[in-house]
């Protein structure tokens, strides 16, 4: 698929993946070479993070997505061309891999023992591709405002765990939003332009 080909080198679009506990405890930080990520941005996201809910910040041509699982906050920062659902899918596979690797160690973890997580950094880039190939589906939606077809990234878990169908999602683009209704087979069952605020 052309959209997946666009992200063949997905790591070039990702600025940073940060895993930490509080303002003083960094567990893992993967950063793309020649990228400036300010520590204050990571600390702000860690303070704002909520359990089980992906939060988004968009500024300066970058998107930040973050979530808290137990006491650990997972953060990803990417170019604003990367859709939020793909960033969330990357965090999903990152959280699963992290807890699969370290869950037993985390219960006895003490602040200052962060060097034991160093090996996880080498797993992060392959997780980008895993998320892209296994955890998302691309659907094509037509917007009547801009008279164009758009490839929209949808997390498989979003549809598979939906409480009812069709599930609804808003694709924000070019200053407006397109509300899309998706069934359990990832087929579009309706769409309409909606107003956005925030």
Language-model features, listed with the residues they occupy:
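Acidic, low-complexity cytosolic segments
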Residues: 1-134
């Amino acid at each position: 698929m052309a959209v997946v080909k666009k992200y063949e080198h997905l790591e070039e679009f990702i600025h940073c993946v940060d895993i930490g506990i509080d303002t003083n405890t960094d567990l893992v930080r993967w950063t793309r070479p020649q990228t400036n990520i300010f520590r204050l941005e990571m600390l702000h996201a860690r303070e704002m993070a909520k359990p089980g809910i992906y939060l988004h910040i968009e500024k300066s041509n970058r998107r930040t997505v973050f979530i808290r699982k137990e006491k650990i906050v997972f953060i990803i920062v990417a170019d604003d061309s990367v859709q939020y659902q793909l960033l969330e899918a990357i965090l999903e596979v990152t959280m699963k891999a992290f807890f699969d690797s370290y869950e037993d160690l985390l219960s006895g973890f003490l602040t200052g023992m962060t060097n034991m997580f160093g090996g996880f950094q080498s797993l992060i880039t392959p997780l980008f591709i895993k998320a892209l190939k296994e955890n998302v589906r691309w659907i094509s939606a037509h917007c009547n405002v801009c008279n164009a077809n758009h490839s929209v990234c949808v997390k498989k878990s979003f549809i598979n765990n939906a409480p009812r169908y069709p599930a609804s999602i808003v694709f924000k683009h070019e200053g407006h939003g397109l509300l899309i209704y998706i069934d359990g087979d990832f087929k579009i069952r309706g769409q309409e332009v909606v107003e956005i605020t925030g």
